[in-house]
Amino acid sequence: RLKEHVGCQDQVIAAYGGFNRVDFWGEGQFRTSPIMITWERLNELQDHLMLFFTGLSRTASDIAAEQVSVSPQKARELRVMHQMVDEAINILKSPHGLGDFGKLLDEGWQLKRSLTGRISTPYIDELYERARRGGCTGGKLIGAGGGGFLLLFAPPEAQAGVAAALDGLLQVPFRFES
């Protein structure tokens, strides 16, 4: 048993692999369900994603502990965030464009930021706003918050503008695997 407050999402995702929905409940209880979309749709999603290292590191357990402590007061926000999972999956499975996925990411990021003041920092907020002005429509920090990697959603034709807006940050190439 870990003696730190850390989420187990990363561990479950790494252990199971694939493109899955993971639902958590109770102490260490979870269920994984594959998200069934075509390889073409997954590539379309991939083509809209950009990953940047913020240059900041943080202690995830401190941020996670604060999130746990405020969870009862933030039940509405957490419920909305949970409902957004179904909406995201519906967007991915629909035959329409992915534009709404970026908007949903932005909405989710704003909700997550409202959970605790330690999710973001003025520097992260500035980076996110620069990316938005550059053409991204949504994004989020990967992990507990406070630093690490910024995942952004931008149409392929806007990605040069996003990269220019975040000049000086390391863009990390990545690909989904089959």
Locate each region found by the language model:
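Glycine-rich active-site/cofactor-binding loop and its immediate structural neighborhood
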Residues: 147
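C-terminal nucleotide
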Residues: 2-5, 9-140, 151-178
